[in-house]
């Protein structure tokens, strides 16, 4: 009997096993490819959704920011019309893009543009926006309080008192800050009221963006003297007249005549003021970096953007003769606020306003000016002919505090608080804080 090759029923054909493994691997690969494709589709759709949401957010953010900017530019006229007020905190203005929008009617269920912060005790005015077809919902303008802002400035109980932006008059090197203008702050601080502006932008699909800005007029820093200098002051001759007695008949508040953190040298017989004619080695100082930041353009106009007879030197300084820094009351009465980012040397010039110089200031010849001059450097005044006549105040705060300012020739510097206040009243309101949500 011949032998046969037989296989057990439990044994597998190697070829069949290979085909099974190949099929399993193919199914696994197909599953992986399917998962990858689904993941890519999910990522792609997510990216589209994110990009779409970002685009909607940016569009609404742009609309809300533009609406806040319109409010900033209109606050002065709203004050003139008594639609908003420094003293009546209930006066509120809404700016709307169309007459069909009324944020004060109905409620959040019946009115998609209803303002949940509206209160029937408010004295409300609804005005049409000047932004034309820009799609936003409304802008609310009212005086700022802690209750309305939703946070405390000093970690205490929220109050309904007005918030101001300004300086602590009693603190040396004080920085501008917001504070509640009540209690002891009324006498210890100097500042201007803050307006809280909220703009809402919402598209038809309900996507919304709100922007809140704090807007105020830049305050005058606390003044200690008609002429204050961080460095020493050298007086040459007897024709230098400085008077800190306030020339304003409206709530006069006199200052020292001349005050210096360093020495005062020379003939001080024509220096007058109250309580002191002059004070040397004063402990008072200014935080010049904060002042420069506060006055920096666009709050003040950049000298290079004004059509003035001032040229920039190769060293980055500025020089001019016959410069008109605004117009005096007798010659047009125009206040001009100028920021010079470098040392300035001018002669035979005149003007009215606020002049801030980030460097040394040199004035020679004839010069007539009404307002406030601030320089981050030493001052050199040399008046000839009728001389240098300044009605207002001058603040010199040199970088290192060791430079000597020189007063020479014919100089007449007299303090007038009303003249200075007039220049600050002419400034546009500016944004001092911003947040969106």
Q: Which residues fall in each region the model found?
A:
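Extracellular beta-sheet-rich ligand-binding/adhesion modules
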Residues: 318, 322, 327, 332-348, ...
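Beta-strand/loop motifs with alternating small/hydrophobic and polar/acidic residues, enriched
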Residues: 2-234, 415-437
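Long, acidic/serine-threonine-rich intrinsically disordered regions with weak helical/coil propensity
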Residues: 104, 108-110, 115, 128, ...
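Predominantly polar beta-repeat domains that present long G/T/S/D/N-rich surfaces used to bind, process
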Residues: 222-301, 362-437
């Amino acid at each position: 009997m011949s032998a046969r090759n037989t296989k057990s029923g439990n044994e597998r054909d190697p070829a069949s096993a290979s085909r099974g493994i190949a099929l399993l691997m193919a199914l696994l690969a197909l599953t992986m490819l399917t998962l990858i494709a689904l993941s890519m589709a999910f990522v792609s759709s997510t990216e589209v959704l994110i990009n779409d949401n970002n685009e909607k957010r940016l569009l609404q953010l742009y609309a809300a920011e533009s609406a806040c900017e319109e409010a900033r530019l209109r606050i002065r006229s709203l004050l003139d019309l008594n639609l908003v007020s420094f003293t009546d905190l209930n006066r509120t203005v809404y700016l709307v893009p169309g007459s069909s929008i009324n944020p004060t009617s109905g409620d959040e269920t019946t009115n998609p543009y209803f303002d949940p912060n509206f209160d029937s005790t408010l004295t409300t005015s609804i005005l049409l926006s000047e932004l034309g077809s820009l799609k936003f919902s409304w802008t609310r303008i009212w005086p700022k309080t802690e209750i309305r802002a939703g946070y405390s400035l000093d970690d205490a109980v929220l109050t309904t008192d007005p918030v101001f932006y300004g300086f602590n008059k009693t603190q040396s090197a004080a920085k501008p800050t917001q504070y509640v203008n009540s209690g002891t702050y009324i006498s210890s601080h100097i500042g201007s009221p803050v307006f809280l502006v909220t703009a809402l932008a919402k598209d038809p699909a309900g996507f919304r963006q709100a922007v809140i800005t704090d807007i105020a007029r830049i305050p005058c820093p606390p003044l200690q003297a008609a002429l204050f200098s961080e460095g020493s002051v050298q007086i040459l001759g007897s024709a230098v007249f400085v008077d800190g007695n306030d020339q304003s008949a409206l709530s006069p508040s006199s200052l020292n005549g001349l005050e210096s953190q360093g020495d005062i040298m020379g003939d001080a017989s024509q220096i007058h003021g109250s309580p002191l004619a002059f004070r040397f080695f004063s402990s008072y100082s200014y935080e010049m970096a904060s002042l420069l930041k506060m006055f920096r353009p666009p709050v003040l106009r950049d000298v290079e953007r004004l059509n003035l007879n001032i040229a920039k030197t190769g060293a980055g300084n500025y020089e001019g003769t016959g410069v008109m820094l605004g117009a005096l009351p007798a010659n047009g009465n125009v206040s001009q606020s100028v920021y010079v980012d470098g040392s300035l040397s001018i002669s035979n010039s005149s003007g009215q306003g606020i002049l801030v110089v980030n460097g040394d200031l040199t004035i020679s010849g004839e010069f007539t000016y009404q307002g406030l001059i601030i320089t981050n450097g030493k001052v050199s005044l040399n008046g000839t002919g009728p001389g240098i006549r300044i009605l207002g105040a001058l603040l010199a705060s040199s970088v290192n505090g060791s430079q000597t300012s020189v007063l020479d020739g014919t100089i007449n510097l007299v303090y007038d608080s009303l003249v200075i206040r007039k220049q600050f009243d002419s400034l546009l309101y500016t944004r001092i804080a911003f947040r969106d949500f």
